[in-house]
Amino acid sequence: MIDIPDQISTLWIAAASAAFLAKHFLADFLFQTDWMAAGKEKPRGWLPPLAAHAGVHGAMTAALFLAVAPPLAWLGLADAILHGLIDRLKSLAARRMRVTPRQAGFWWLFGADQSLHHLTHLGLAILLAAAGTPAA
């Protein structure tokens, strides 16, 4: 059961938010290989590279929860699934709209994708901070 206290430590929410921002930068950019980035956008054969990319996100989220609240490490799987769904929907929308990086529509989709990932991380950061906040 996830128990959110009435008040969450400001320090914990700041630290958890920063941790998820760093995790996202690492997993979505630095640790994403060319195979993942190009492969997840293909009309066929997209599942293995997308699963690998989303798996990196999930593993890093699980690691954050393992450090603070091990019973909540399963949220890594939830993050991986959500991340994969968001990325796949963006890919399908880009293909349907036939947009490229030279068009504004591509960047609108990229912005929506990143915003949804950050919204996911906001929720996860709240849960991580709640788990780390000492009981009153």
PLM region spans:
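Hydrophobic alpha-helical transmembrane segments
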Residues: 1-136
